[in-house]
């Protein structure tokens, strides 16, 4: 396992329960970061995954929101998603945060994200 985390962010971290944890980021990407030593193929030939392990915190999430109740996603696997939730403040990972059309005091992150459907913010 490397001393420096080979990814900037990770949405699908798989970590051991040890302290500190040993983590692998299972995010599917078109190109692995330059810091990744072992970049392997996925089922889809256009996607790759960094197979490096890192000892410690897997780092921040990549998607532009932490959770989403109203996700609009493509049917691809993994999907491309947008979140149309109206929030008080967009997540720090959101690049384009605009006022809601229906409620200007609320905000909507209009970024698209390629990866797993985000978790819900409120339980069903």
Swiss-Prot record:
Pfam families, alphabetized: Bowman-Birk_leg (PF00228)
Disulphide bonds in the chain: 9-62, 10-25, 15-23, 32-39, 36-50, 67-121, 68-83, 73-81, 90-97, 94-109
Coiled coil: none
InterPro entries found in the cross-reference section: Bowman-Birk_prot_inh, Prot_inh_BBI
CDD domains: BBI
UniProt KW keywords: Calcium, Disulfide bond, Protease inhibitor, Repeat, Serine protease inhibitor
GO MF, any single term: serine-type endopeptidase inhibitor activity
Any one Gene Ontology cellular component term annotated for this protein: extracellular region
Site entry (Reactive bond), positions: 17-18, 75-76
Cited function: This inhibitor interacts with two molecules of trypsin.
Family listed: Belongs to the Bowman-Birk serine protease inhibitor family.
Name of the protein this chain belongs to: Bowman-Birk type trypsin inhibitor
Organism: Hordeum vulgare
């Amino acid at each position: 396992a490397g001393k420096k985390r080979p990814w900037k962010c990770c949405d699908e971290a798989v970590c051991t329960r040890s302290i500190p944890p040993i983590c692998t980021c299972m995010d599917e990407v078109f190109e692995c970061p330059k810091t990744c030593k072992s970049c392997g193929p996925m089922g889809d030939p256009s996607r790759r995954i960094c197979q490096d392990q890192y000892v410690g915190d897997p780092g921040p999430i990549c998607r532009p929101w932490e959770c989403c109740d109203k996700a609009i996603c493509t049917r691809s696997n993994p999907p491309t998603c947008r979140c149309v939730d109206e929030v008080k403040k967009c997540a720090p990972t959101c690049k384009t945060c605009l006022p809601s059309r229906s409620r200007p005091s609320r905000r909507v992150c209009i970024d698209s994200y390629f990866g797993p459907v985000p978790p819900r913010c409120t339980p069903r």
